[in-house]
Amino acid sequence: MRAIGVFEYITLRAVLACATALLIGLVAGPRVIRRLTEMKIGQAVRAYGPESHLVKTGTPTMGGALILIAIAISTLLWADWTNRFVWVVLLVTFGFGWIGWMDDYRKVVYRDPEGMPARQKFFWQATIGLVAAVYLAFAVSAPANTELWPLFKAWVGSGFTMPLPTRADLIVPFFKSVSYPLGVLGFVALTWAVIVGTSNAVNLTDGLDGLAIMPTVMVGSALGIFAYVVGRVDYSKYLLFPYIPGAAELMVLCAAIGGAGLAFLWFNAYPAQVFMGDVGALALGGALGTIAVIVRQEIVLFIMGGVFVVETLSVMVQVTWFKYTKRKYGQGRRIFRMAPLHHHFEVGGWKETQVVVRFWIITMMLVLVGLSTLKLR
């Protein structure tokens, strides 16, 4: 009985979840790649991308499905099935994975590098993000095992003015006990933006071999540490974080993300044998955003995921400036040689591996900055 009791420890189950996901990915990876190759599910490279990427045409894609399967099996093996946060993260992850799958399907079957129309993709992202945001507004606020429907009815009955408890506030890192109350609508709006924004940010970053997956592993692992802290009464009190009942269980899921991500990197490292595709990138981004919201570390996610943020901003700035100058001068002008930012450096002469490893180093430093907020307050 004592031997069985050790599995009650979240830290042990997190280690086992990581090892299980890693093993599943490494064992199943070659079979999945071989099957994708036989089915001719190859990458369609955009014509306006760097010329050096044309050699990637035909490389198996949609390998993100392997990541999701490894995460799901590992999480269901080692996590607490009664934990509402585990389920909401899994559902969001697979919801965004479904969007990515449909997008990749159009690219592969119809040989359309653009995939699903942008408006259609955003509609489904916005819908899933909104449902998750409304649910989390009450799930984060409520004590463990509390029914959420009565809370929702109470909020509606109050004329949509019912405040949320302080643990649902927006936490400002590096400052002791500084937070801002959001209210239900503010919480929903912020959560929606974080989930949808992170999903798209990871997807935009996934443009070079190994570029997106390693930062995802690092950020996800760090969020697992935050989940463990805020999910424990003693640690959260000592470190001045809000106590979120049940959040510690997300450490198991974060560990599964780390293990599955490392297994995928084995095959995605330059020169990549397989790409994760939108099915992986959108799903992993959605998972990171959802976990960050639950552990109340939205701003810290912004810091640790700085590479994702800068990649996204580079696209937004490039598109906005191009449209503005085209309207004003009759010819569009660019700020970057090419967007997203990793292509800017490629066109500037950096080797693909240089861009990837340097972005990894930057992410590692940013994650350390994020983790420092556990104590530097």
UniProtKB/Swiss-Prot annotation:
Q: What is its main location?
A: membrane
State any GO CC term: plasma membrane
Residue intervals passing through the bilayer: 9-29, 59-79, 85-105, 122-142, 155-175, 178-198, 210-230, 247-267, 274-294, 299-319, 354-374
Q: Name one GO molecular function term.
A: phospho-N-acetylmuramoyl-pentapeptide-transferase activity
E.C. no: 2.7.8.13
User: Which family does this protein fall into?
Assistant: Belongs to the glycosyltransferase 4 family. MraY subfamily.
Describe its function: Catalyzes the initial step of the lipid cycle reactions in the biosynthesis of the cell wall peptidoglycan: transfers peptidoglycan precursor phospho-MurNAc-pentapeptide from UDP-MurNAc-pentapeptide onto the lipid carrier undecaprenyl phosphate, yielding undecaprenyl-pyrophosphoryl-MurNAc-pentapeptide, known as lipid I.
Q: What is this protein called?
A: Phospho-N-acetylmuramoyl-pentapeptide-transferase
